[in-house]
């Protein structure tokens, strides 16, 4: 995959920036009024796709865009590789069986098998992979375990040798260059131009219409969880790593 994806990206560039191919598409596009509605729609979409991918740029800018696209393809690969490596590197090792309180037997057995496969027979190992992560967040009575898992997941590839922070910075810079080459003020404008929202402001407005009631509902749920915790003598303030656990109880 590491070798194939940049090659695939380059192949796409060679196709969408091929002058002869685009001329054929443009000829049909310029005479699209004679087509059936579905044919006209298909031609318009093809034409727009080619333009969005640099078909109208001059030769020098096409080469620059190709270089940016190849850079982005490699950065995306690095980003995903860092995520995978960071995921595989994370583990929570439990040595005391009392800390497994609340967990289903299937989860405990899986953790024991994972420990055995890592040469730690007699212990339990939990990982960031969903079958291991989710039951722990939902059912583990040990709050410290839940906190470890939650923070490990939400800071994945945040620092260390698998940090994606420098990769993200490079992606942002490359996307900015790509948008500028294609005549957009920023990458957000480039992306929204091709969808129903059309502008970044419209997209943000739509997201906020969803976000505000969603946040309000979460506050209600957390209040219910806090009331449950208080009623059962749990001397805590509900934190993010408590959410799934108490959601199972209220």
Question: Where are these predicted regions, by residue range?
Answer:
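Short His/Asp/Glu-rich catalytic/ion-coordination signatures at enzyme active sites or charged loops
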Residues: 1-4, 25-67, 125-166, 170, ...
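N-terminal helix-rich structural modules
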Residues: 1-106, 110
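Active-site-proximal, well-structured secondary-structure segments within enzyme catalytic domains
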Residues: 42, 74, 81, 86-127, ...
């Amino acid at each position: 995959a590491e070798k194939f994806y940049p090659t695939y990206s380059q192949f796409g560039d060679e196709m969408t920036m091929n002058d002869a191919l685009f001329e054929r598409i443009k000829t049909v596009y310029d005479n699209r009024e004679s087509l059936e509605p579905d044919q006209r729609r298909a031609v318009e979409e093809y034409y727009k796709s080619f333009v969005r991918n640099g078909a109208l740029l001059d030769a020098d800018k096409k080469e620059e865009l190709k270089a940016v696209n190849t850079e982005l393809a490699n950065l995306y690969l690095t980003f995903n590789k860092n995520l995978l490596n960071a995921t595989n590197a994370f583990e929570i090792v439990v040595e005391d069986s009392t800390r497994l309180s609340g967990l289903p037997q299937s989860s405990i057995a899986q953790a024991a098998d994972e420990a055995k496969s890592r040469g730690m027979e007699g212990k339990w190992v939990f990982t960031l992979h969903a079958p291991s992560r989710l039951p722990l967040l939902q059912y583990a009575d040990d709050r410290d375990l839940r906190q470890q898992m939650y923070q490990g997941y939400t800071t994945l590839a945040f620092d260390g040798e698998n940090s994606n922070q420098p990769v993200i910075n490079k992606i942002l810079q490359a996307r900015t260059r790509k948008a500028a080459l294609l005549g957009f003020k920023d990458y957000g404008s480039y992306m929204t131009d091709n969808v129903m929202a059309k502008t970044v402001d419209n997209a943000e407005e739509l997201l906020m219409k969803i976000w505000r009631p969603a946040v309000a509902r979460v506050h209600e749920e957390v209040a219910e969880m806090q009331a449950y915790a208080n009623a059962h003598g749990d001397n805590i303030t509900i934190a993010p790593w408590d959410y799934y656990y108490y959601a199972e109880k209220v």
